[in-house]
Design a protein with these regions (language model features):
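Non-cytosolic head/periplasmic domains of membrane-anchored proteins
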Residues: 106-191
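N-terminal "mature head" segments of proteins
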Residues: 2-140, 167, 209, 415, ...
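Repeated scaffold domains used in trafficking and secretory/extracellular systems
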Residues: 76-90, 125-140, 170-187, 211-224, ...
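Structural motif
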Residues: 102-110, 150-157, 195-201, 230-237, ...
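Recurrent small/Gly-Pro-centered beta-turn motifs in extracellular repeat architectures
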Residues: 90-99, 144-149, 191-194, 228-229, ...
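Loop/turn-rich, solvent-exposed surfaces of beta-rich toroidal or solenoidal domains
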Residues: 327-401
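A short beta-strand motif characteristic of beta-propeller blades
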Residues: 54, 65-79, 118-125, 164-174, ...
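Blade-level signature of beta-propeller repeat domains, shared across WD40, Kelch, NHL, RCC1
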Residues: 404-444
Length: 444
């Protein structure tokens, strides 16, 4: 009987060790479903070719007089040059264009649907002069473009559905001042006052709602953001300034708030336990989802890094562990399907991306390629990245994620206006002279 009892105890202990070290991860991986990946809409197995084509003239910018520079998308090869590619809303892209005329340089807001290359509205003329406007989305319906001469600013508010100017005139917003500085926050425009707070912006580029605080906006995810307020954070909607409190007891404070696409994590300091903080995850309504440990942050929808132990762990928003890895916490991450790519290098010139399959727990072949800010997207196996140095003769490179080998590249003229962007699920190329746009699709 004693021997039998000992065998049972040993089996239970062994089972507990197995569950804590391996079994719980296997169980969690079997239940976990990766969030949808925003794949490119066309195969990238071969070098893509032009699909639809359009020109600055087709977008509505009038032709220049003979002997004058042709109108073009207003890209610049200067380090602090014009931001010609303004923003995207789903498959819609918005660009700043320029044309020359007797009165000087005219600036234009243009838009296209990247699915078919159709013009969203005839180009909207903004200011005339050498000073380029800076444009900001302000929700799904409006674009606000600003010109700041150093002493005052003028605004143009454009209805993105009708393509009409609904307001033009003075605005308290500024581009270069610490007071009421215009700042992009997701798909909205806000005005920030350093150490004072954040304002919303209305249909006449006027100030609307106000939230006092540090003047630094954290996030956002969708239209939800956070702002520091003297040892704590306040959470609010960028659409209307509505504030809400996450699902925590009174007296709780927040620190190190970090957003992903469907929620946020925060270091939570419960009243009376300020020296024993814990990181928890929340959805975008402030509802608590799970506990991550003493240190953690989001990496993708519903996916977090827990860095509280000697190893780092990939966990779900509920705190279920999918993977444990020895070594330094990731310098960057990218989720493609069920594979998490982890940059193990802190040298931007020498990236080292190690893939982990979160369904099997297996390590893949590491790649010394750029999957950070220059990454444009993938069809599932081929990753495409932009080449952003205007002086070189390439505009894009593509790599096989299975072998890490480059499979194709796209040439351009050095020091030209050629660029490549992603709009929705489509890669869009600007011609070397800046006058034409085309989609990039798989060859027939």
């Amino acid at each position: 009987m004693l021997a039998t009892a000992l065998v049972v105890v040993v089996a239970l202990v062994a089972g507990g060790i197995w569950w804590n070290s391996i079994g719980s991860e296997m169980w969690a991986r079997a239940r976990w479903q990766p969030p949808p990946t925003a794949y490119l809409g066309s195969s990238m197995q071969q070098a893509p070719v032009p699909g639809w084509r359009t020109s600055v003239n087709v977008l509505g910018v009038p032709s220049s007089p003979p002997g004058v520079e042709a109108p073009r998308i207003a890209v610049s090869n200067k380090q602090d040059g014009t931001h010609a590619f303004i923003d995207t809303l789903e498959n819609r892209g918005y660009f700043l264009a320029r044309s020359a005329g007797p009165s000087g340089t005219s600036w234009w807001l243009t838009g296209l649907d990247a699915t078919q290359g159709h013009t969203l509205f005839p180009a909207v003329q903004l200011n005339i002069g050498e000073r380029a406007p800076e444009c900001f989305l302000n929700g799904p319906d409006a674009m606000v473009c600003l010109v700041d001469d150093g002493s005052a600013a003028t605004a143009w508010v454009v209805d993105l559905h009708a393509g009409t100017v609904t307001y033009t005139g003075p605005t308290p917003l500024r581009l270069f001042s610490a007071k009421l500085r215009a700042e992009r926050a997701g798909d909205y425009l806000v005005a920030v006052m350093e150490k004072e707070g954040v304002y919303g912006v209305g249909p006449k580029a006027e100030l609307t709602w106000f939230i006092p605080g540090s003047g630094a906006v954290w996030g956002p995810a969708k239209d939800i953001a956070a702002q520091g307020t003297g040892g704590n954070y306040v959470f609010f909607s960028l659409a209307d300034g509505h504030m809400f409190t996450p699902d925590v007891p009174d007296g709780t404070a927040f620190d190190e708030v970090r957003f992903n696409v469907d929620g946020f994590s925060a270091r939570v300091l419960y009243d009376g336990e300020r020296f024993n903080p814990i990181v928890e995850s929340f959805d975008l309504t402030g509802k608590k989802i799970g506990t991550l440990g003493r240190d953690g942050y989001p990496v993708a929808a519903g996916l977090y890094i827990d860095a509280s132990a000697s190893d780092w762990r990939v966990v779900t928003a509920e705190g279920s562990r999918l993977l444990s890895v020895e070594g330094h916490i990731p310098y960057d991450t990218l989720l493609i399907g069920s594979t998490l790519y982890v940059n193990e290098s802190n040298n931007a010139q020498m990236p080292y991306w190690q893939p982990y399959d979160l369904k099997s727990g297996e390590k893949g072949k590491p790649c010394e390629i750029e999957l950070g800010e220059k990454y444009l997207g993938t069809d599932g196996t081929i990753a495409v990245r932009a080449v952003t140095n205007p002086q070189v003769d390439l505009i894009a490179k593509a790599f096989d994620l299975r072998t890490c080998e480059m499979v194709w590249s796209l040439p351009k003229e050095p020091n030209s206006f050629g660029r490549i962007w992603r709009i929705g699920d489509t890669l869009v190329r600007l011609s070397d002279d800046g006058t034409e746009l085309n989609s990039l699709v798989a060859p027939d």
